[in-house]
A protein has these predicted regions:
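FAD-binding subdomain of flavoenzyme oxidoreductases
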Residues: 1-109
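C-terminal substrate-recognition/cap domain of FAD-linked oxidoreductases
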Residues: 69-73, 79-241
Length: 241
């Protein structure tokens, strides 16, 4: 119900969409106790399409009691590429290059140095602490599709000036790469329990420029901030500590 109320996404929403893209039907209860249903199992159901209205309504329209979802087959293989950069602008450029090349990764996430430092103290994911920014780029599909896409991504990362590139060798290493990213918010909470999480979207080609602007504001206003976000769709999450 919470996912429906917020139209939640996540690290794999770049390829697989938000909650609304994976819903068929929602049942809920309105404030006056009326049981209502939105959506249908059929694609050509009559009437207004109100499912997108209730999805993301943050509980204002109904309390969700039942959800019918689409199921997507699990891919045969997934590999995660970890790339380190000595400059946030280069990392932002790499994101723009990947998307401009027509590649839609299963996930494309970015973390700056303060974020990776906080995460390493918390979960020990093996991130390169000397990097000013890291990218996590996941490819999934058949073994042949994954190999081809990883090769293209690696070439683009090298063109963008990556100082280190690692490809997960097995499922355990892939999960370890992602464990750090998924623990970023709890890791920030260990440093500052009352941090503020911002949420905004900007053009991917301006990511590096935006991160530099955030760094300038940190200096100007004597504040601390870590950045961990969905780079593939330009969705920033600066955490003000």
């Amino acid at each position: 119900g919470g996912n429906v109320a917020e139209n939640s996404g996540g690290v794999h929403c770049l390829k697989y969409g938000l909650t609304i893209h994976n819903l068929l039907k929602v049942r809920g209860v309105t404030i006056n106790g009326e049981i209502v249903e939105f959506g249908s199992l059929g694609l050509d159901a009559p009437g207004y399409d109100l499912l997108p209205l209730v999805t993301g309504s943050e509980g204002m329209l109904a309390v969700v009691t039942e959800v019918t979802v689409k199921l997507t087959p699990r891919p045969q293989l997934a590999r995660c590429v970890l790339a380190a950069f000595d400059d946030v602008v280069k990392a932002g450029d790499a994101v723009a290059r990947i998307i401009a090349a027509g590649i839609i990764p299963a996930g494309l996430e970015m973390m700056d140095q303060p974020a990776t430092a906080a995460v390493e103290e918390f979960v020990h994911a093996g991130y390169p602490l000397e990097a000013q920014a890291i990218l996590l780029c996941e490819s999934d599909g058949t073994p042949e599709e994954v190999a081809e896409e990883v090769g293209r991504v690696r070439a683009l990362l090298e063109q963008s000036g990556a100082t280190e590139i690692r490809v997960s060798r097995d499922e355990a290493e892939r999960l370890r790469f992602w464990a750090g990213r998924k623990a970023a918010f709890p890791a920030a909470g260990r440093i500052s329990p009352d941090y503020y999480c911002m949420d905004g979207t900007i053009p991917r080609k301006r990511l590096g420029e935006m991160l530099q602007a955030i760094q300038a504001m940190e200096t100007k206003y004597a504040m601390r901030c870590i950045n961990v976000f969905h780079a593939g769709d330009g969705n920033l999450h600066p955490l003000i500590l």
